[in-house]
């Protein structure tokens, strides 16, 4: 998974902390965590295409949450940034080279055991991400750093 997922998740929480009426530019969100603005902007645009954020152009434009954090799962963000494809792709190497399963070998027609195991693991991972929403993440972040929302709002106001 790319670092863009982490950046996107933090950006969603930061947008919630900034307030519902404030649009925040990609450059300002990037500066808050010392990230490259152009790369973060790509992640934010992906979130906007997925309906997680809205974007508005212009000098007072930027990004806002399109829906409440409680309505956005971690899986929604991962899928928006990484795409919906499975992380593991079996290349069927068991069918190549001197060790290839022959057409009459027992189990050659069956699914690859490794692909099957990886698919089960990915399904569990996706279910776990889908079961947790961004509001739960926001709450945990505020328990860990209660001053963070106010620090962000003050920093944005000073810019």
Question: Locations of the language-model features?
Answer:
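N-terminal helix-turn-helix DNA-binding core of bacterial DNA-binding proteins
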Residues: 3-5, 9-35
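Conserved segment of winged-helix/HTH DNA-binding domains
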Residues: 3, 69-95, 114, 118, ...
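Short, hydrophobic-biased segments on the C-terminal half of alpha helices
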Residues: 12, 44-45
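C-terminal regulatory/oligomerization modules of transcriptional regulators
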Residues: 90-159
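Beta-hairpin "wing" of winged helix-turn-helix
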Residues: 51-66
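Key DNA-contact positions within bacterial/archaeal DNA-binding proteins
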Residues: 38
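Alpha-helical residues within the helix-turn-helix
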Residues: 31, 48-49
